[in-house]
């Protein structure tokens, strides 16, 4: 049913692979069972599943998940997601890994094109639409940054990597100490940096 094809990347809580699942191309995230911080590993795995039942064009869709893993692997669980490619907004902004944006008559002298105004507006609208949907479902991402915005071959932005996300109780906000203070410090929400409550 599930066949790993090639690694796409790795991070603090696990590795991501391109794979096939029931014949369809998918992305598979294996959350590692960290011996240093087991609670954080578990929280990251379950946080990824905050969006498991949600479907939106600007949010990476979870297809399946399992806590079963081969004994030889130090994995807490496996999450199967739609495959949206391996290009992120980070690649596009900083010119890394974005083969499809190379240009001979580059504007910045770095061999890459600057984002056009149309692309900038389209990407911004996609991200805001995805965020508005997540917030309407009571989900806050808590690690929104260019590296977690995936861009499909059709140029659609999809928000991914929900390992730091929180599902807020209806009508309530959470104090910052309730949230796992994960995520990237330089991209942390202003209210968290100021010690205020998290709201959607």
From Swiss-Prot:
- Upper taxonomic classification of the species? Eukaryota, Metazoa, Chordata, Craniata, Vertebrata
Question: What are the catalytic residues?
Answer: 143
MF term (GO), any: protein serine kinase activity
Protein biosynthesis listed as a keyword? no
Instruction: Please list the residues that bind ATP.
Output: 8-16, 29
Coiled-coil boundaries: none
> Locate the Protein kinase domain: which residues?
2-200
Spell out the InterPro entries in the cross-references. Kinase-like_dom_sf (IPR011009), Prot_kinase_dom (IPR000719), Protein_kinase_ATP_BS (IPR017441), Ser/Thr_kinase_AS (IPR008271), Ser/Thr_Kinases-Pseudokinases (IPR051681)
List UniProt keywords, sorted A-Z.
ATP-binding, Kinase, Nucleotide-binding, Serine/threonine-protein kinase, Transferase
Which protein are we looking at? Serine/threonine-protein kinase mos
């Amino acid at each position: 049913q599930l066949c790993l094809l090639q690694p796409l990347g790795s991070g603090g809580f696990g590795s991501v692979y391109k794979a096939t699942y029931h014949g369809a191309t998918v992305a598979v995230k294996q959350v590692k069972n960290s011996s240093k911080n087991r609670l954080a590993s578990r929280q990251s795995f379950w946080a990824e599943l905050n969006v498991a039942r949600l479907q939106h064009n600007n949010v990476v869709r979870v297809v399946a998940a399992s806590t079963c893993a081969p004994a030889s692997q130090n994995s807490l669980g496996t999450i199967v997601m739609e495959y949206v490619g391996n290009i992120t907004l980070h690649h596009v902004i900083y010119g890394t890994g974005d083969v499809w944006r190379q240009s001979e008559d580059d504007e910045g002298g770095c061999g890459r094109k600057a984002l056009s105004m149309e692309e900038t507006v389209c990407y911004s609208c996609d991200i805001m639409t995805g965020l508005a949907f997540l917030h309407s479902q009571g989900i806050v991402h808590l690690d929104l940054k260019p590296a977690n915005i995936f861009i499909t071959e059709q140029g659609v932005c999809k928000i991914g990597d929900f390992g730091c996300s929180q599902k807020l109780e209806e009508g309530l906000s959470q104090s910052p100490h309730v949230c796992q203070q994960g995520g990237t410090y330089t991209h942390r929400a202003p209210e968290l940096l100021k010690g205020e409550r998290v709201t959607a």
